Amino acid sequence: MIPPAQDYASSRASFLDLVRAAGSVVESHLHPEQGPAGEELACDVARFGAPPGDAATVVLISSGLHGVEGHAGWGLQRLLVESGRLATLKPSVAVVLVHAVNPFGFAW
């Protein structure tokens, strides 16, 4: 079963903790609005594998675009990171995880 997110804020915190623990550097793009509890909203991007410019293949996996699907999408990203497979990528491959393309929609 896919472990869905309970809400945007806990999903984002878990995403950031998990991908950083797995060795990724995260780039965050802040949204100008705030979430329902006044929390910061951001689209967070984590990259694994080959650095920019060195990858022959890049796989982009988004948790979702509109918002509501972000709950299940984060669950899939979580399963992938926890599987350990991102640590065994070929040298020419990169995987980019995008958490919450639309953090406003995800949060509300």
Each model region followed by its residue ranges:
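Structured catalytic-domain cores with a bias toward divalent-metal coordination
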Residues: 1-108
